[in-house]
């Protein structure tokens, strides 16, 4: 039976010609007649010449088949290793993740970013100047009224009692935390509490700030000498500037000396430091402790209650915030301005200040004005608080804030915005704009004046300024930028990228010196704290497989876009090292790095297209390696996602497809495959055809790949119609473009080309061949898909690779463990593909070949099941089923 099947194998048709339906007298793809008929001799004496001619034709067919097979190769593979598969699925997932990372709040920063130091929204005027430096604070007492306010309103972070007991026991506490988390106000609260009932309890200067430039040793000397007439029992707050280049942190002996001096005088001191490599030895010692941030919900609740009390004029509450022990709280905008914005806007100790009601959200619709009007309509402070709780949980407001948790100053601003909206002074759009500004202000503070100390003039004693600490100074900044670009990637990938950027920033800052790069000074926990980041376990793509790894994200969807906007719009000198760094990331073989970086490059190009095109897109588009050209194409597509830049991107891609160098045409093809770089689907296909047929099909492989990528879009029917037109084209290059695309359609998995998330019909079939997934999910297209694949099976030069592809499809019917896989798609496609008897004979021959395969024999049971899928019951013959299933 096997020999008969081989003998009955249909003859090879010549050039294909598309038809809507199969004619009984001719194959679907059209034919020029049987090529083998030409082998018949004209006369008995011409047998030798005929044999030679037939042999030459056979060699030409083999050469054509080899050329065709070469065009079905992976165009994304490196020239040095074309046989090595590329992980297109991982690249697609990484690109999708990067787009989600930067989609939140882009182009939506609504307030004036030219003066971020002061924010004016409605009648709210709040100072948020990150350039205030702790070095401007000198020795001086903390006013009693400020201590009173701290006593009434401070919210105790988790572990506060433990911190107080440690301070009481050792007299000295080194308190570590990220800037802006309320660490300074917690220090003041601790000092206020431990000195309240001490020897200086009635002294108006019982808590003092120490000059940060003098350091721990000089503070110890002052305490011992009792300088300035300071009484026993005084509390000292010191914030040394450990992040300045060349500054050495105090050692353990310095701290012991200070603790001894404090004990002798019955005094206390809290040294506030930023977490990081410089302060870690201090925090690891016996005096060290980490200050946890105050809880966001309580911060907002206390601030909101205070604002509403002030504006509502409640006679019971205004001015009488009560004590923290009573569960009341307050706070306002009149706090002190310490270097971290911590002190004056910090936490209230009140618990349960916000008891939100369950009033229906749609009960008070107020357009652009506050819902329900002013306080007269609200009726009472409790009703205002109830409505405030509803407004705070409004999905639109939550999305506009874009931060997982708020720091003290942010909580104060957020509460002020909510209160202003409820009381009628802030409109809806102003509210949302102010909420979006929170992330922008954080980004501004992270970058403003980071390297000011490096640019300081040399000291008057003739010494050169110290620049040896550039790497330590720039690493936190580099980590934030790397996290904005690579958020969602593995922690190790982000950290490695941050070190690369640290090097580039250091070299740019001091090109005459080689930056020192410590190898054992990393502190992952400090990196997370200083960058408002969070770790999470998640999948990481490695060599085509998913493994569980430690991923890292910003604690807020709005932060990545805010960081990139701040970096590109306000800090022009940093562009050069960042561009060099992005080019390095473009060469990274891991898709989770290179594709995320490409998306970020596209977003940066949107903010300044002239610069992005000249420095990133065009140079990489002309690069010799496919990886760099894919990077450029992805960046272009990301820019095309913005309506403001879509026209420019389309003009660039159009010019490249017509007049570009081979590298530029290749890049244009990849950009076209995303479906946004031309005015319509027909224009996209025209451009891909121009690229694919030019220069004898030199770039037909990349053109066909991107035709297949377009089949995942809603305009799939338009693509199939154009493929059918190309199969009937007079030009062989157009025919080859169609045939290669058809074969590639059968060999490409859905998740290699699909941008959709799981949960869509195609997204749920990520490991299916795209041909079968379309047949299963788009039944109206099954006939067109079958006709096109039939044409590839019946064309001489494409037949071999098409049969190999069909075998791959048949083997995907079920998984190794017997569970169904693509059976649904095969059930839709095979009957349309084998409607005629000679097609069924061909399938029979292929199934028998698969059963005889010594390496991967197909079981008789599976062969029988596949035959039943393909051939309707009324057409089956019992003897055929007995022979081959």
Feature annotation, model-predicted:
Residues 3-4, 63-141, 697:
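Long, low-complexity intrinsically disordered regions enriched in small/polar
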Residues 156-167:
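Pre-Walker A adenine-sensing motif
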Residues 170-186:
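Walker A/P-loop nucleotide-binding motif
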């Amino acid at each position: 039976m096997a020999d008969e099947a081989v003998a009955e194998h249909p003859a090879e048709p010549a050039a294909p010609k598309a038809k809507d339906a199969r004619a009984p007298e001719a194959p679907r793809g059209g034919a020029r007649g049987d090529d083998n008929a030409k082998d018949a001799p004209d006369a008995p004496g011409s047998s030798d010449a005929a044999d030679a001619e037939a042999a030459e034709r056979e060699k030409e067919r083999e050469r054509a088949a080899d050329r065709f097979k070469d065009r079905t190769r992976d165009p994304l593979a490196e020239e040095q290793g074309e046989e090595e598969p590329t992980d297109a699925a991982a690249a697609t997932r990484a690109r999708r993740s990067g787009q989600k990372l930067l989609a939140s709040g882009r182009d939506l920063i609504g307030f004036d970013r030219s003066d971020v130091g002061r924010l004016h929204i409605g009648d709210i005027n709040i100072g948020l100047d990150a350039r205030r430096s702790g070095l401007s604070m000198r020795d001086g007492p903390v006013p009693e009224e400020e201590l009173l306010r701290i006593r009434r309103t401070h919210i105790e972070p988790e572990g506060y009692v433990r911190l107080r007991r440690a301070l009481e026991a050792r007299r000295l506490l080194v308190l570590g935390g990220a800037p802006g988390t309320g660490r300074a106000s917690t220090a003041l609260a601790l000092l206020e509490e431990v000195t309240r009932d001490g020897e200086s309890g009635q002294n108006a200067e019982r808590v003092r700030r120490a000059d940060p430039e003098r350091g721990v040793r000089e503070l110890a000397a002052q305490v011992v000498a009792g300088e300035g007439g300071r009484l026993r029992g005084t509390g000292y707050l010191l914030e040394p500037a450990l992040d300045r280049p060349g500054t050495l942190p105090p050692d353990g002996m310095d701290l012991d000396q200070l603790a001894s001096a404090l004990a002798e005088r019955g005094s206390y001191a809290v040294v506030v430091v930023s977490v990081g490599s410089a302060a870690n030895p201090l925090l690891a010692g016996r005096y060290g402790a980490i200050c946890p941030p105050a809880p966001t919900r309580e911060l907002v609740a206390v601030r909101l209650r205070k604002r509403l009390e002030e504006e509502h004029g409640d006679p019971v509450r205004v001015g009488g915030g009560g004590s923290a022990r009573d569960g009341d709280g307050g706070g306002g905008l009149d706090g002190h301005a310490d270097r971290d914005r911590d002190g004056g806007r910090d936490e209230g100790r009140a618990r349960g200040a916000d008891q939100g009601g369950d009033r229906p959200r749609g009960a008070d619709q107020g357009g652009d004005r506050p819902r329900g009007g002013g306080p007269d309509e609200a009726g009472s402070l409790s009703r205002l608080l109830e409505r405030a709780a509803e407004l705070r949980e409004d999905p639109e407001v939550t999305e506009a804030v874009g931060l997982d948790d708020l720091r003290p100053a942010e909580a104060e601003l957020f509460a002020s915005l909510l209160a202003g909206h409820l009381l009628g002074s802030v409109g809806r759009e102003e509210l949302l704009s102010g909420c979006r500004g929170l992330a922008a202000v954080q980004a501004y503070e992270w970058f403003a004046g980071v390297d000011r100390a490096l640019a300081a003039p040399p000291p008057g004693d003739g010494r050169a300024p110290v620049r040896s600490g550039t790497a330590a100074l720039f690493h936190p900044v580099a980590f934030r930028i790397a996290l904005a670009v690579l958020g969602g990637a593995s922690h190790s990938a982000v950290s490695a990228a941050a070190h690369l950027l640290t090097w580039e920033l250091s070299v740019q800052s001091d090109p005459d010196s080689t930056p020192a790069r410590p190898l054992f000074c990393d502190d992952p926990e400090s990196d997370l704290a200083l960058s408002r980041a969070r770790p999470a376990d998640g999948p990481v793509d490695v060599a085509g497989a998913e493994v569980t790894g430690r991923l890292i994200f910003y604690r807020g969807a709005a932060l990545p876009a805010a960081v990139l906007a701040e970096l590109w719009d306000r800090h022009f000198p940093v562009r050069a090292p960042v561009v060099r760094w992005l080019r390095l990331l473009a060469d990274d073989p891991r898709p989770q790095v290179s594709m995320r970086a490409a998306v970020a490059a596209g977003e940066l190009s949107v903010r300044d297209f002239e610069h992005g095109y000249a420095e990133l897109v065009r140079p990489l588009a002309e690069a010799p390696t496919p990886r760099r050209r894919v990077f450029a194409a992805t960046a272009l597509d990301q820019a095309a996602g913005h309506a403001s830049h879509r026209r420019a991107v389309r003009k660039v891609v159009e010019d490249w497809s017509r007049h570009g160098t081979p590298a530029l045409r290749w890049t244009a093809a990849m950009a076209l495959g995303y479906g946004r770089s031309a005015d319509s689907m027909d224009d996209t296909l025209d451009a891909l055809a121009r690229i694919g047929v030019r220069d004898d099909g030199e770039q037909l492989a990349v053109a066909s790949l991107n035709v297949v990528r377009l089949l995942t879009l809603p305009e799939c029917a338009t693509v199939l119609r154009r493929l059918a037109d190309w199969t009937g084209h007079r030009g062989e290059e157009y025919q080859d473009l169609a045939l290669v695309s058809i074969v590639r359609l059968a060999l490409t998995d859905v998740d290699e080309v699909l941008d959709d998330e799981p949960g869509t019909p195609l997204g749920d079939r990520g490991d299916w061949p795209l041909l079968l997934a379309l047949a299963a999910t788009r039944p109206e297209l099954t006939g067109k898909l079958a006709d096109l694949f039939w044409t590839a099976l019946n064309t001489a030069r494409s037949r071999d690779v098409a049969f190999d592809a069909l075998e791959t499809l048949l083997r995907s019917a079920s998984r190794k463990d017997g569970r169904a896989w693509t059976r649904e798609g095969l059930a839709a496609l095979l009957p349309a593909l084998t409607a005629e008897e000679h097609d069924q004979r061909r399938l029979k021959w292929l199934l028998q070949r698969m059963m005889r395969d010594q390496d991967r024999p197909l079981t008789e049971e599976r062969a029988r099941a596949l035959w039943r899928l393909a051939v309707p019951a009324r057409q089956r013959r019992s003897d055929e089923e007995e022979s081959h299933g």
